[in-house]
Amino acid sequence: MHANHPRTLAANLATFARFGCLKDLPEIVYRILHGPRDERKDGDDDSSRVHRRGGSRNNKRRCVGGGAEAAKARRQKETEHAQVVLSRYDSDESFRFLYDSVAELFAELLKSDLEHLRSGDTAKIGLAAKWCPSLRSSYDRSTLLCEAIARRVFPRDSSPEYLGIPDKHYAYRVRNRLRREVHVPLRKVLELPEVYMSAGKWDELPYARVASRAMRQYKLAFDKHDKSGVAGFYDEVRAGLTRIPADAVLPHEILAAALKGEHDESAELQWRRMVSSLVSEGRLSNCIAMCALSSSVEKPPASAAIALGLLISELSQDPWKGRVITFDATHQLHKVRGASLVDKLRTLAAVRAQKGANLQAVFNKILNVAVAGALSKDMMVKRVFVLSDMEFDGWVGGEAWVSEHEAIKKKFAAEGFGVPEVVFWNVGTSKASVPVVAAQAGVALVSGYSKNLVRLFLEADGVFTPSAIMADAISGAEYDALEVLD
């Protein structure tokens, strides 16, 4: 976009940040300057870096021999990066406009947050301080953004001490002020876990304020440095004295450890919080899932299918609650057993796809259970989700579905029930063979897997139509703020 529509990109930065996150803006600058970053190696995440920071004496001894050469190479790389930034800024008008726009956006947000801090209105403080590059951080060394932001927060005419001094002295002073007077106080009031971790104040961590993703990301570090503290927090959550964040995290992400057979107390509590929240909203209240999986359930997209299957089973009401329909000739209501997520997923993963599954028989099974249990109309299954990472070979489709569906409707009507809708979701591909077409009554087809699809699934109460998916993709209010300039 920068190559073809540079002014449009720069002018819409604030809107793009709302689509994603403010941290995307320094990354855009970095990639334009230096190209894509190398993918991190497995295990090389922020949590591992934090608790390695101090290092051990043995590590320090091992570094003595090559320390001077490594430091020299590092300084050389920083110099090269700085030269790239300055050269591009001076010679490329489009890049200069983008760079200035990023710096000005951060500066304005930080100044606004400082005003909220001074007035005591801390609830209005945003996350600009969290995602603004820190002094001497990787982003700062490779983009020089800290200085650019600092110059805008503390311009020369903002203080007599800056008048008449050399530019490099002015830059040094405002960079330090940015850290001391902006980053530190704002990050402190945000209670960011990284602030406590880097200061070694593990026992002061406000776990109830730690975002759900950070709880997962720093799990090993929390357990290592503050095991009793995090255990006490979990006890308070179980007792109902506080709540564990479960924001912006999807079902299969919460289940990541359990899918590997590992117990994760944080995930257990986040899962309960998610289920409780969705139940209170009445989401997916009378639905049932069929999970037809052929591959390992540990990785997407199969992990998304089994996570949604478990979630649907826990959100339903009796007699559907805690059950899934087997994907075989028997179409049994399989009970998901176990107290922990590991146990539940183990029983659910054991239900493998087999030959003989038939949609007509699935409806017959549901109707028989409803009649035998003398269920009221509002207790009937509203929607059947067929979740699979395979193609739907052998299922009814095309013109045959019309007669099949009419026969099913008559059976249900004879017992006073409406017919459940069917959602076929092949999470394994976007080009699956399909049993029905999107226009057929009582059926929705979803192919492929993405986080946005999972979010839509939860937000739309499992109602999938082509128009709903398209509307979700392009009709958000945030799109109204976009403008094209070139």
Descriptions of predicted regions:
Residues 1-304, 314-486:
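Long lumenal/extracellular ectodomains of secretory and single-pass membrane proteins
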